[in-house]
Amino acid sequence: MRHIYSTYKEHYKALIFLGLPIVIGQIGVIVLGFADTLMIGHHSTIELGAASFVNNVFNLAIIFSTGFSYGLTPIVGGLYGTRQYAPAGQALRNSLLANLMVALLLTVCMTVLYLNIERLGQPEELIPLIKPYYLVLLASLVFVMLFNGFKQFTDGITDTKTAMWILLGGNVLNIIGNYILIYGKLGLPELGLLGAGVSTLFSRIVMVIIFIIIFMRSPRFVRYKIGFFRLGWSRAIFGHLNGLGWPVAFQMGMETASFSLSAIMIGWLGTIALASHQVMLAISQFTFMMYYGMGAAVAVRVSNFKGQNDIINVRRSAYAGFHLMITLGVVLSLIVFLCRNYLGGWFTDSQEVAAMVTSLIFPFLVYQFGDGLQITFANALRGISDVKLMMVIAFVAYFIISLPVGYFCGFVIGWGVVGVWMAFPFGLTSAGLMLWWRFHHMTKLPEPHPKT
């Protein structure tokens, strides 16, 4: 044990230093998700069901777009590791253009889905609530992608604190706006679920504006602005961004799609089941976002060492990240387990929803190991720019394994919403094992040749 600690000690410290600000920023996102669910749930159980459907659909678009923006991190991380600051700024400029194009493409796709929303089998009483909320969130997609471009750039140059403070500030603004607009305070109309959407749109616009101001005015970004403004558009960088971004986007998108399609299946079971699913998603985002923070730090460290062609420390960074991820998972799972009988009541006044939430805790706890495993090694592979096989792994894990298992357990066996959730441990753990194997294979150290 002591040997393991001495081997990985410096990596633990560096990952915590890089990852902690990202985790804190994600805690802000978690608190926002909790606040959204709490405020909407106490305003109306029907609105909570509508929010569950729309948020699941948009989580797919946002995670997909975020995955695409991740293509910037290994590029910037490698350039930063070799002190090429101007090209890193040029990469940011190209990334913002690519992100904007992806955002517009997603907006078109989500508009087509909106026009067919009544064909997805959701309860009729939810449709009038779903539509306006959906449109407001649709308008915010472009700003999510612009923010992601700046965030992945600052993460890649190991400045994780800037995005943390902007995220925290934006989330505080969003929560205040939620309270005012959902309940109709300060003389404004009571908008309910629509008010939550308007507040989200406004806060996302503000966060992008703040990031632009900081990048333009802060002295620490001067050496990057030279490349940003003078080097201009590059076909090679643009192609590299797309080559890295699309596979990661599809890998993360397929993972999220398994949750989103599961939400559609759960919607067939009624409003109560859908509301309980939304509460459990808010809880599961708590652990996912914490893992995400550490995973992002793994990607940055791995890309820095990859830029230096230091394979030993590439491997050590990844495995140190997994050690920290497992420790974090045990602590978070223990907290959720101890609070299992109270969680549902914190989010809604409905006893039926609260009871159903408690029944979903077991499958949630089971998939924590798999979630930590797949996040760690997906980010490690992203750090070494080995991303193409990730799409195949995601397809097998989430579409061949997870979704069929969810349908079988939920509807064929008749376990209902618990059965649908039982699929997640199978999908996430199988993905994690395949991603680990790929990373292990791609970073094998050459065996020393025997002396002759």
Residue ranges and their predicted role:
Residues 27, 31-49, 117-124, 180-193, ...:
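Helix-terminus/linker motif at the lipid-water interface of multi-pass membrane proteins
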Residues 48-112, 144-158, 162-163, 263, ...:
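Small-residue-rich hydrophobic transmembrane alpha-helices
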Residues 17-36, 136, 147, 170, ...:
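Transmembrane helical elements of multi-pass membrane transporters/channels
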Residues 69, 137-155, 163-171, 196-211, ...:
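Short runs within selected transmembrane alpha-helices of multi-pass transporters and secretion channels
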Residues 7-38, 42-43, 59-71, 75, ...:
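N-terminal transmembrane alpha-helices
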Residues 45-56, 130, 134, 197, ...:
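Small-residue hotspots at the loop-to-helix junctions and early N-terminal turns
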Residues 20, 24, 54-57, 97, ...:
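Hydrophobic residues within alpha-helical transmembrane segments
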Residues 1-19, 76-142, 188-246, 302-367, ...:
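Short alpha-helical transmembrane segments in multi-pass integral membrane proteins
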